[in-house]
């Protein structure tokens, strides 16, 4: 996909049957950002019309084999690798996910599964978990999704609540 900088994307994950919040986020951002991603465990059918215009992968709770296990999306010169994470054993190690991201030469690797919002860098790649939009785990009991803004110099990760309020404590910036 041809995109000029800055590039902005929306990332959500682990909605676990809550179709309405996926629709809400899609309506709010479609046409205003360069891409929308869902990192799996929607528990919706892969043929659901909500997925039109959304990059979506299969999670461990998605029994519909119509979803891909992983995607690689190129927006301008930015390579985004996307997966749920369970097949890479992320509960135990980052090694397999990291190896795949390196093989794809990914600038950003999106994952879900853990229901914990996180953004961190290893080597070239910035790893982003948007948290769960429905069932958060870990110390932050907030249902979240992420907005990522990429420009020449930086990758900025912002987290938002279901009410689309910025959860500023989690904002991070990474050098490109």
Language-model features: where?
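Core catalytic region of metal-dependent phosphoesterases/phosphodiesterases
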Residues: 7-76
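Active-site-proximal beta-strand elements of phosphoester/diester hydrolases
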Residues: 8-16, 79-86, 126-131
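Helix-adjacent hinge/juxtasegments
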Residues: 57-60, 66-107
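Short, small-residue-biased leader/transition segments that mark boundaries at the very start
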Residues: 1-5
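A short, polar/proline- and glycine-enriched secondary-structure boundary/capping micro-motif
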Residues: 21-23, 91-95, 139, 165-173
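Conserved beta-sheet core of the metallophosphoesterase superfamily
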Residues: 55, 91-154
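Active-site environment of divalent metal-dependent phosphoester hydrolases
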Residues: 16-21, 42-47, 61-66, 88-93, ...
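Charged phosphate-binding loop/patch that engages nucleotide di/tri-phosphates or the phosphate backbone
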Residues: 151-176
């Amino acid at each position: 996909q041809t995109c000029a900088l800055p590039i902005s994307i929306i990332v959500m994950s682990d909605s676990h049957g809550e179709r309405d919040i996926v629709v809400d986020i899609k309506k709010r951002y479609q046409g205003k950002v360069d891409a929308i991603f869902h990192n799996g465990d929607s528990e919706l059918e892969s043929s659901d019309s909500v997925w039109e215009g959304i990059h979506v992968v299969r999670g461990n709770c998605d029994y519909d084999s119509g979803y891909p296990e992983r995607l690689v999306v190129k927006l301008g010169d930015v390579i985004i690798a996307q997966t749920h994470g369970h097949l890479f054993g992320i509960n135990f190690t980052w090694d397999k996910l990291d190896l795949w991201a390196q093989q794809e030469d990914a600038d950003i690797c999106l994952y879900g599964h853990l229901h914990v919002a996180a953004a961190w860098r290893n080597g070239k790649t910035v790893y982003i978990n948007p948290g769960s939009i429905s069932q958060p785990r870990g110390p932050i009991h907030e249902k979240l999704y992420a907005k990522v803004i990429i420009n020449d110099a930086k990758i900025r990760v912002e987290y938002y609540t279901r009410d689309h309020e910025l959860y500023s404590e989690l904002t991070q910036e990474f050098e490109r």
